[in-house]
């Protein structure tokens, strides 16, 4: 379980124990150590305490400017990052891409130059092209936080998923975690595989063959302790955590699925399938949920669902990332 401080003194003690952070940018979790993941979890516990106070704000990043640069639509992630920045007293520069010079053909690097000229200390970036945040990180003095790039990565989502699990389970070591859905097009799945495997979880991926990354089959192992199943009953059996993934219809080429109804028939997590998991299994989803496609309504709104908790915890995780990347020692 993650620690949440009870007093200001405990807050200072917990943060003083967070040492050795080396990341200027957060691009994915493949280059994070287990110890660094633990640092994020511990810091997020402090931030969650701040968010539970009557005044949900501290001056840790007062005087800093955080820009949000989203080339794709977003409600949860963008709002979560903005609230996280404001909770740390940072100024937020929200660039509306559709109404900016980007719509006139301005390049990504030119846009980043403009944001830095305006004083941005950090840039939260979502882009449809995999690798775009890496290009930005090599170009900018500002810290870059990847809020999702193409099919590649969504590190803050994976971190909040880990944090949410640890609010309910004592550790991830040995936990059986099943991810069901569009693995091929899911940046959430890719970052979760890295993060969860580093924390010692045993991961099962479940999807139709056409929605698995190319080159995989049921005998493949692409990460330590990761296996692949195309039968949802086998995949869910004995699981401690079951995570549905959104069917990425906007990213798919025609012909990957015979139809949405057929997908739901064979890969929807419903109450009957969920009974195969452990009685205290958690149900998760990065959102937005296509109800009665990936998850049945009864599962989405059932007692085992922690989907809304994931949203709440996302703010704490993003506060932690801002705090750690800024190098701040104040809270």
From Swiss-Prot:
Pathway assignment: Pyrimidine metabolism; UMP biosynthesis via de novo pathway; (S)-dihydroorotate from bicarbonate: step 2/3
Positions contributing to L-aspartate binding: 104, 187, 246
Record-level GO cellular component terms: cytosol
Class of the enzyme per the UniProt entry, highest EC level: transferase
Gene3D superfamilies: Aspartate/ornithine carbamoyltransferase
Keyword Repressor: no
Keyword field: Pyrimidine biosynthesis, Transferase
Keyword Signal carried by entry: no
Catalytic activity: carbamoyl phosphate + L-aspartate = N-carbamoyl-L-aspartate + phosphate + H(+)
Molecular function terms from GO: amino acid binding; aspartate carbamoyltransferase activity
The organism's place on the tree of life at top rank: Bacteria
HAMAP family reported in the protein's UniProt record: Asp_carb_tr (MF_00001)
Subunit description: Heterododecamer (2C3:3R2) of six catalytic PyrB chains organized as two trimers (C3), and six regulatory PyrI chains organized as three dimers (R2).
UniProt name for this protein: Aspartate carbamoyltransferase catalytic subunit
Gene: pyrB
């Amino acid at each position: 379980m993650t620690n949440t401080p009870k007093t200001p003194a405990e807050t200072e003690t917990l943060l003083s124990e967070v040492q050795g952070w080396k990341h200027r940018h957060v691009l994915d979790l493949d280059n994070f150590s287990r110890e660094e993941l633990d640092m994020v979890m511990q810091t997020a516990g402090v931030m969650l305490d701040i968010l539970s106070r009557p005044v949900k704000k501290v001056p840790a990043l007062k005087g800093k400017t955080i820009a949000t640069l989203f080339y794709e639509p977003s409600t949860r992630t963008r709002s979560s990052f903005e609230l996280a920045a404001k909770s740390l007293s940072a100024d937020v520069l929200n660039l509306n891409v559709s109404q900016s010079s980007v719509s006139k053909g301005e390049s990504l690097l030119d846009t980043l130059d403009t944001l830095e000229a305006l004083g941005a200390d950090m840039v939260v970036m979502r882009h449809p092209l995999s690798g775009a945040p890496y290009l930005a990180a090599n170009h900018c003095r500002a810290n870059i936080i990847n809020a999702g790039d193409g099919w590649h990565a969504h590190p803050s989502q994976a971190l909040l998923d880990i944090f949410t699990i640890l609010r309910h389970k004592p550790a991830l070591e040995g936990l059986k975690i099943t991810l069901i859905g569009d693995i091929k097009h899911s940046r959430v799945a890719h970052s979760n595989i890295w993060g969860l495997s580093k924390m010692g979880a045993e991961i099962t991926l479940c999807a139709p063959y056409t929605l698995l990354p190319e080159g995989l089959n049921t005998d493949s192992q692409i990460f330590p302790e990761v296996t692949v199943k195309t039968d949802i009953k086998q995949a869910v059996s004995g699981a401690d955590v079951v995570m549905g993934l959104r069917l990425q219809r906007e990213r798919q080429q025609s012909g990957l699925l015979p139809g949405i109804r057929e997908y739901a028939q064979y890969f929807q997590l419903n109450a009957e399938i969920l009974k195969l998991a452990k009685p205290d299994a958690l149900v998760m989803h990065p959102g937005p949920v296509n109800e009665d496609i990936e998850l049945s309504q009864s599962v989405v709104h059932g007692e085992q669902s922690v989907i809304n908790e994931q949203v709440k915890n996302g703010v704490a995780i993003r506060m932690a990332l801002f705090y750690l990347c800024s190098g701040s020692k104040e809270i």
